[in-house]
């Protein structure tokens, strides 16, 4: 992770001279690309800080999965320091669950919560019970909604303080879905809906999951937006060896990472 951030710093310093020579109108446009990579995506925050300290302006920011969250929040004005503080103070055990805060529970719900460690839904409709993921992600969705206060309407992401885009995958047909507009928190949630872990986001006739499946390093999206120079932060997971594939989640994660790697090579 540190090596990746250092590489970004070196590249950033190589770019700083041209920016000091050319006027604002003449300089080339810079796009920052933040890959998916689970918890390692926190490294994106440090990379953004390095870019800022190098004095390099960011004209576009594009992300997938965790990169979409960091990128989306940065695009609306959060600083790296604010993002780092936000990450540190969160109760991630709560966020990555479907638990309800005890303060929001009724007395009956509190008693039931104290009795049972796990709660599974039983219904006559199996489709209703199988929502497509272990975690519905409502707590995360609530956090995203709180963090994007003021951007809850359907908006054009090109009109944000920094033009932004993120990637999701439509599992109905395998298409790549690029969010250039819409509700920001919904776009971020759709981009990080890891199959089998988080429930997909249903929008119109689409069923949207983690964008890493189709484009984990969307440099092509940044170029299409107008970026002449790409600063990429790649924190994609390395493939596991056979001795580390010992559970269903391990194997599912490996399948996702294999798909991500195949598509990633096209953009590097």
Predicted segments — roles?
Residues 8-18:
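Bacterial N-terminal signal peptides
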Residues 1-3:
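N-terminal secretory signal peptides that target proteins for export/translocation
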Residues 5, 21-64, 72-268:
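Patatin-like phospholipase
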